[in-house]
C-alpha cells in the first residue's frame, strides 16, 4: 500500500501536478470549511524523458460544449468501438484509424501510465522562432561591451532558421535594417512620442501580406517571408555580429547632475508593434536589456534630475511617486498587446540603482517572460544567467515553449475559480467556470506566451456539489489540463494531463480528507494567494488574512481541549504548515521593509512562476552545516545552528551564502589551510564551496554568491533569515550555551506557535 507521500511524489513526477487535498470534500459547504481551497500547482511542460511525443492528433469528445480528450479514465467498449467521455458521459465513435484496437491492443492514451501524454499536430506550417533584441545604449562603455559580447554569444546558439531583429535606444530609438550588405541603415524615432502599430507599419513600410498569409491556415505551406528588420540568422549572422560590435554609447551629451535621457517605453512599444504587424500568433521573444530607468516619454519612471531619487516604497505609500501610475499603465497596455499576439517579453535589468521593474513587471508577468536583475552586465551573474536562457534538451532543442494556451475541463461537481501565474485570461466562459473568482478567473482558458519546463501555475477550484446530493460510493472527481503550444522545433504540440481524486463525506470521513493534505503544496498555494493580494492590498491586511486562515485551519484540524494551549496537537500531515507560514510572513515577498520596489517585484515575479521545490526554498531557505564532527548535514533554520566551529551553507534561491563561524574564521585568517598538517581543515573549507558551485551551475537565474564570516557585514543575510530563537533579550537566560544571539525584536517561531495555539483553542475565537 503506497503512503500518501509516495502517491504525491509519483503524481508530481508523472503529471507535474500537486494538489492541496488528495481526497476532496463532497459538498460545497464542507469544502468552504476546509480553509485551504481545493487547488493544484500545475507544471504544463514538466520534463518527462520517458514520454516521447505521439505523431498523431488527439481524439475529442463529440459534444461541442465538452470536447474533452480521450484518456485512461474513459470507459471503452472495444467490440462496438465506442468510448464514453468521463466528463459529460457522451458516447463517441472511435475514428477509422482506431479500427484495430482491442483489450490487448490499446492506444497509448488509454494506458494508465500515460495520464499525461503529448501529441504532435502535423497540419499547418512550421514557424521559425523569432528573437528581437531591444538594447539600451545609455550605459558605461565596459557594461555595453560586456552586453555586446553576451548578445554575440547568443547568436551562435540560435537555430539557423530563427529570425532576429535589433532595436537600440537612448534619447532616440533606432530600428535597424538587417538585410543591407556593407552599410548600416536604421530608422530613427523620437523617444518622446508613442506610435500605434498602424503608424509604425506605414513608417517602416511593412507589408501586410505575411499577416494575412499567416492566419489563413493549412493551405499556405510556406512560412511568412521575413522582412528587412527580421532576418534569418544564417543569412545575417556576420552582419549582425559586426553591427553589435560597432554599437556605441548613446552620443547625446549628459549635463552634470542629470541622468541620461532613456526612452525605454517607446522602444518597447516599437518592438511590440513591429512583431504585431509582421508575425502575430507566432513564437517570438522580445529580449530587452536596460541599464537604468526610463527618463523620458511614455513609461518614464523618474525625471532626469539626479537630485530627485527614484521612488521608494515610502514614496508610493505616501502617494508621492508621480510617475508610477502613468508608467505602469503604459507598460500594462504593451504587456496585454504582446500577450494577445502570443509574444514573450523578457527584461534583463543591470544597474546599481533601480531601473523601473516595478512599472515594467507586468511585461514578463503577463507574457511568461524572464525577469533578470543584476548590478552590471559585466558580471558572471548576468552572463551565466543569459547563457542559460538558451539551454537545450537532449534532442538539441531549446527548453522553451511559445504561444501556449491552457484549457481545463472538470467533472460536474467541481468548477474553476481561477489561476495565478504567468498567464492572461482568454475569457472563455464554459459550464465549468465558477462565479467566485480567485486570481485570473471567469474563464477556463488562459494564454501562456512563454513556457519553460519549470513554469508552474496555481489553479484554484470550487466544489459545487450540494450538501443534499450525495456522490455515489466510490465516485471520483476528474480534471483535465490541455496545453497547446509551439515547441522550439517549430511544431505545434498538445500535452494532455488527466487526473482523478476520490470524494469523501467530510462529516463521516474527515480523517481520510485530513490524511490526504499536502502541506507543502498548500503552503505554496496560500502563499501565491497572499502575494497576489499584496499587489493591491495593504501589507498588514494581507498578514492578518494569512494569520486568520492559519488559526481557522488549526481549529478545524488540530486536536485540543478548549482553552488549554498545552493540549494542542497537529498530526504529521499538518505539522510543518505553521512553520512555512511563519517564514512566509517574514519573507521579502510580504515584507517590503529594506527592499526597493524593484527588488520586491523581482522576488515576487520568480515566486509566481517557479515549481514547488524552488518555491519552498524561497519561503524557507535550506541550511547545511559542515564541521569536523561528521559529514555535512541539514540543520534547522535557527540562530541556535550558528556555532563557532561550523561552516554554514544557506540556499535562499536568490542567494547562496557560505558563513564561517568565529573559530573557523580565525583559523582561516591565520592561514592554517595552507599548512600541510592541516589538510583536513582545507578540505572542510572546500566542501561547502563545491556544493555551492553545483547549485550555481544549474539554477536559473543564477543566484548571488556570498562568502562571509562571523562579524562580517554580509552575515546580515543569514541573520535576517534564521528563526531568532536567541536574541539580545534572552541571550543571558540560564543554561543558554550555544548559538548566536540575533539583535532583533521579531518574534521567534516558538513565540509565534505559542500565540497560535492560544488563539486556536480559545473558546472566544
UniProtKB/Swiss-Prot annotation:
Gelsolin-like repeats lie at residues 632-718. This is Protein transport protein Sec23A. It is found in: Cytoplasmic vesicle, COPII-coated vesicle membrane; Endoplasmic reticulum membrane; Cytoplasm, Cytosol. InterPro entries: ADF-H/Gelsolin-like_dom_sf, Gelsolin-like_dom, Gelsolin-like_dom_sf, Sec23, Sec23/24_helical_dom, Sec23/24_helical_dom_sf, Sec23/24_trunk_dom, Sec23_24_beta_S. Component of the coat protein complex II (COPII) which promotes the formation of transport vesicles from the endoplasmic reticulum (ER). The coat has two main functions, the physical deformation of the endoplasmic reticulum membrane into vesicles and the selection of cargo molecules for their transport to the Golgi complex. Required for the translocation of insulin-induced glucose transporter SLC2A4/GLUT4 to the cell membrane. It comes from Homo sapiens. GO terms for cellular component: COPII vesicle coat; cytosol; endoplasmic reticulum; endoplasmic reticulum exit site; endoplasmic reticulum membrane; ER to Golgi transport vesicle membrane; Golgi membrane; perinuclear region of cytoplasm. The keyword Zinc applies. Ubiquitously expressed. Changing residue 678 to A: Decreased interaction with MIA3. GO terms for biological process: COPII-coated vesicle cargo loading; intracellular protein transport; protein localization to plasma membrane. The Gelsolin-like repeat mediates interaction with proteins containing PPP motifs that include MIA2, MIA3 but also SEC31A. These interactions are probably competitive. It is a peripheral membrane protein. Keywords: Acetylation, Cytoplasm, Cytoplasmic vesicle, Disease variant, Endoplasmic reticulum, ER-Golgi transport, Membrane, Metal-binding, Phosphoprotein, Protein transport, Transport, Zinc. Belongs to the SEC23/SEC24 family. SEC23 subfamily. It is linked to Craniolenticulosutural dysplasia: Autosomal recessive syndrome characterized by late-closing fontanels, sutural cataracts, facial dysmorphisms and skeletal defects. Gene3D superfamilies: beta-sandwich domain of Sec23/24 (2.60.40.1670), Sec23/Sec24 helical domain (1.20.120.730), Severin (3.40.20.10), von Willebrand factor, type A domain (3.40.50.410), Zn-finger domain of Sec23/24 (2.30.30.380). The modification Phosphothreonine is found at residue 308. GO terms for molecular function: GTPase activator activity; zinc ion binding.
